[in-house]
Amino acid sequence: MLDIKFVRENPDVVRQNIRNKFQDAKLPLVDEVIALDLRNREIKKEVETLRANHKKASKQYGALRAQGKLEEAEKLRAEDAASEERMTALSAEEKQVEADLKQKMMIIPNIIDPSVPIGKDDSENVEVERFGEPVVPDFEVPYHTDIMESFNGIDLDSARKVAGNGFYYLMGDIARLHSAVISYARDFMINRGFTYCVPPFMIRSDVVTGVMSFAEMDAMMYKIEGEDLYLIGTSEHSMIGKFIDTVNKEENLPYTLTSYSPCFRKEKGAHGLEERGVYRIHQFEKQEMIVICKPEDSMMWYDKLWKNTVDLFRSMDIPVRTLECCSCDLADLKVKSVDVEAWSPRQKKYFEVGSCSNLGDAQARRLGIRVVGPDKTKYLAHTLNNTVVAPPRMLIAFLENNLQADGSVRIPEVLRPYMGGMEKMVPKK
């Protein structure tokens, strides 16, 4: 959410930003917001004047009564009563105007960074850099669920009976590998100075609207019936929410946290669910990282965060590349975002395994995450988030890139302590 003062003083900048995101239907919102803001300020000014007059009238009324000027006193009292009725009406209008203003402000997208490429969809995202040499083996790489099934490691049919499409049972060595990757990612981030945290897996609606746009909320979040609670789509939601309505000392920044959680997503929208496979599903587990920092440090942390993911994947011998997300591919709260994609030997192309985002002060403004400096000046923090690792997408990349010609899967050295020293997984069938 933008600062209303910024919108008031820079309406053309806001309009051009909307055009750059190809959201022209939102252009009328700018004039609507400016009109509501003007009316809101007019109301406040009139209420302030009426309150001052009321205070003055109260003193005059007492003085007139003391002087025996009862007729004048009653006339003044009647006038003041009319002013009080006006204040009551204005207060009700003010409440409605502020609610309408906030609702419209939350729909206007954040101002994207000037470095973001302008594009209409994710096909116009721009490759930034490749890490590791993509390998195409001289044998056929099976579909990822076929690899898992060769280890008796996945049961989609039973999961479908129990919960419907978009769920799975992982078993045996595949389940063990899943846990090993999560544990390794946790320790990887701890060793890089991040504080480990296991957050709440449900959050209230005020936190939901604080961390994401209405469009994201509708497409992703599961609501608990009869409760003001939602299942988290990523632990970023509850981790950023941890700082709601806080004033943080500048000397304590940055806060760097890495968190584990299950994640729940409706996956409503253009992509939908895969009928076969575990690439896009309703439930998965993820290791996340978030940063709360000073505004001038957020771009530095942005680069550090996505590099952590690249380093993690490269430590497991998985080639990756980074893609700069274009303007239309950015969610409305994001200032800048990069996708990390892993190499798929089977498809002979890269696919998304994580995303790093700088949200500027958008989440901080919605949630009231403030910082107080040495001179007692208060300002909004900047927030960032990044995927450390998200099985089962990570498992797809891992299995394909470490698969051997005999059907076994090599375990990279960094994962062996988490797999009981196992050097390779041998198929059961």
Residue ranges and their predicted role:
Residues 27, 130-429:
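TRNA-recognition modules of translation machinery and tRNA-sensing kinases, especially anticodon-binding
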Residues 1-134, 149, 153:
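N-terminal alpha-helical targeting/anchoring segments
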